[in-house]
Design a protein with these regions (language model features):
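ALDH superfamily catalytic-core signature
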Residues: 1-87, 114
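Short, surface-exposed connector motifs at secondary-structure boundaries
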Residues: 3, 120-127, 238-243
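Short beta-strand/turn micro-motifs composed of small residues
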Residues: 14, 133, 157, 245-246
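Short, charged/polar "capping" segments at the starts of alpha-helices
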Residues: 20-21, 137-141, 248-255
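Conserved C-terminal structural/oligomerization subdomain of aldehyde/semialdehyde dehydrogenase
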Residues: 70-209
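ATP/NTP phosphate-donor binding region
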Residues: 210-255
Length: 255
């Protein structure tokens, strides 16, 4: 729906080694890369007085371009701004809820993760992140998952469709209401489904936790057993410690 799904992509960070190929693919798919002067015009259209311009939400890329006073092919699918700053002062770093995408370049995988971390921090913790990678690179996948404070971490999946569940995975419940956990100030960190709308009663009868004790291999008892027991434990069984159970009555009576 032209970026209106809250899980839709807002920014993409690309490794320098494949940046040119990714850019070519975007162009092939009908995206439009903004020129420097056009970039500034779209910046002023994305935010109005520091807040998202509601007029761009869910609009076509060409319509947004027209609002900004620039001309793009009418069939343009996404407006892409190549920017450097991931700071909140960069308009393209914000959630845009429209076919407008920020594109960043990173020299290393670690740098790409750092940029993504900052974008998540600025845009709001807990929502969704996506990683496109060779799935044999498990170490990188784990590093990305550990760094992202997002409740949905998608692999090789378009986030707008993948985040709402069912279409590209079977781990996320189909839903358009996506929980962001305590990171995002929500009570749940998963996709909200039927189970979250049901009141569940639990009848709990009293039960006691089971207790148990492990007894020693040998237990010595009867009057006068202590010297024999200590000798056997030390010389035959080579034990260095023992536990003696007694009380004043037993002690006074020679036990």
């Amino acid at each position: 729906d032209k970026g209106m799904i809250c899980a839709s992509e807002q920014s993409v960070t690309v490794l320098e080694s494949v940046y040119k190929k990714v850019k070519e693919e975007f162009l092939y798919r009908g995206c439009y890369f903004l020129k420097p002067d056009e970039l500034e015009k779209v910046r002023k259209t994305i935010l109005i007085n520091g807040a998202l311009n509601a007029k761009i939400v869910g609009q076509k890329a060409a319509t947004i371009a027209e609002m900004a006073g620039i001309a793009v092919p009418p069939e343009t699918k996404i407006l892409i701004g190549e920017v450097e700053s991931v700071d909140i002062s960069e308009e393209f770093a914000h959630e845009k809820l429209s076919p407008v995408l920020a594109m960043y370049k990173a020299k290393t995988f670690d740098e790409a993760i750092a940029k993504a971390e900052q974008l998540v921090a600025d845009g709001g913790y807990g929502h969704t992140s996506a990683l496109y990678i060779d799935t044999r690179e498990k170490e990188k996948m784990e590093k990305h998952a550990a760094a992202m404070k997002t409740c949905r971490i998608l692999i090789n999946t378009p986030s707008s469709q993948g985040g709402i569940g069912d279409l590209y995975n079977f781990k996320l419940v189909p839903s358009l209401t996506l929980g962001c956990g305590s990171w995002g100030g929500n009570s749940v960190s998963e996709n909200v489904g039927v189970k979250h709308l049901i009141n569940i009663k639990t009848v709990a009868e009293r039960r006691e936790n089971m207790l148990w004790i492990r007894t020693p291999e040998k237990v010595y008892f009867k009057k006068g057993c202590l010297p024999v027991a200590l000798d056997e434990l030390g010389t035959v069984m080579h034990k260095k410690r023992c536990f003696i159970v007694t009380d004043s009555f037993l002690y006074k009576n020679g036990y």
